[in-house]
Regions:
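Non-catalytic, mobile gating and regulatory segments of ester bond hydrolases
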Residues: 1-20
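Cofactor-binding active-site loop characterized by glycine-rich and histidine/acidic residues
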Residues: 11, 30-36, 46-131
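Conserved N-terminal diphosphate/IPP-binding helix and adjacent helical/loop segment
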Residues: 16-30, 41
C-alpha cells in the first residue's frame, strides 16, 4: 500500500509484531533456498531482513503490487549476495496477497499481470539452479 503521509513511530509501532513475524518468514525462506542448493551462507541476506521489512511495510512509498508507480520510492541493494533477501521478501509478500485475495475475493489484493510479474515461493526452489 502506498504511504501517503509521513509515517510516525506511534502509527507504525502497532504493526511491529506483524513485522517480526514477516521477518521470521523471510528468514526461513532464505535458509530454505540457500540450504536446498548448498549455496553460500545467509548472513548478508539475513542481516538486511529487518531493514527491508520496516522500510517496505511502512516507511517507503512502495507497493509490491505496483512498483512501477511514478512516485514510488526505490530501494537498491548493491551487494549481489543480498539477492536472496529480495527474492524471499517478494515471495512472502506475494503469498500474503494471494491468501488475502483467496479469503476475501477483493481484487485489490491481485497483482496486475501477476503470473508474469510475481515472484512466488515456488520460484525460490530454482535459485542458483544451473541446469
Amino acid at each position: 500500500m502506498q504511504t501517503l503521509d509521513r509515517p510516525t513511530f506511534e502509527a507504525l509501532s502497532v504493526n511491529f509484531g506483524h513485522w517480526k513475524k514477516t521477518g521470521d518468514l523471510i528468514d526461513q525462506c532464505i535458509d530454505l533456498m540457500l540450504n536446498l542448493r548448498q549455496s553460500d551462507h545467509p548472513g548478508g541476506s539475513r542481516s538486511k531482513v529487518p531493514f527491508l521489512v520496516s522500510t517496505t511495510l511502512g516507511a517507503m512509498r512502495w507497493d509490491v503490487r505496483r512498483p512501477e508507480l511514478p512516485f514510488a520510492d526505490r530501494f537498491v541493494l548493491v551487494a549481489g549476495h543480498c539477492c536472496p533477501v529480495v527474492y524471499a521478501m517478494l515471495a512472502v509478500y506475494n503469498e500474503a496477497l494471494r491468501l488475502r485475495h483467496e479469503q476475501t475475493g477483493d481484487p485489490r489484493y491481485l497483482v496486475p499481470g501477476g503470473e508474469q510479474r510475481q515472484l512466488v515461493w515456488q520460484d525460490l526452489l530454482w535459485l542458483r539452479h544451473n541446469g
